[in-house]
């Protein structure tokens, strides 16, 4: 669930604080957050959204990794293959649904443009002229990118974002590291033909990686004490094994993991 779901449970008194476990380690940016002075969530990864692209197709067309919105759009257009007016290979695929895939993966180019959504008092300021202009131009970009997508896609969720790239139906997609696992398992011929890049802004000044956290919560039950004991045992003994179970998808948010020999020895 989202942070709002966790906060609802915390405010309702249904969660056990995990502050004593969280404070034992250093965390990446925005990794460990508190509500009412306590940690209610033990993170284990960033779900970073990167843009996957076909390196072999880039080489064929002499394309470079884009540094601006315009360059990204031109690359998508250049790699779109049409026959008799129909798109046979899309230049890209993007989320198109009122769901968590859209919330998670769509907005890298907008975040790179750095509009302000709220002021320091949580008032909505996205409609201020400068912010509205950035958001409007992003929507225009999205509309142009849509024209390079395979036809007939009225909704696009997690499944399509992965499957269309893995099967070679599109040249770009937005996803986390699970794409790599899917390529190696389902289409190994493409497993050495992909690359990744961060979402650029419109002027080439900066890039962004949208992300979402995964982690653990502990609910209050008749076995609350045992629940926390189990969580501590799991963190001490199997936390890294858990991360290795989806090694490309689970980018650790706990900073000490990157120096841990158990993490490094993964083949």
Describe each model-derived feature in a short phrase.
Residues 35-44, 49, 73-125, 170:
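Extracytoplasmic/periplasmic solute-binding protein
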Residues 69-74, 153-167:
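Short helix-initiation/N-cap motifs at beta->coil->alpha
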Residues 76-78, 123-155:
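Glycine-centered hinge/linker elements that transmit conformational signals in sensory
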Residues 178-190, 202-267:
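C-terminal lobe and pocket-closing loops
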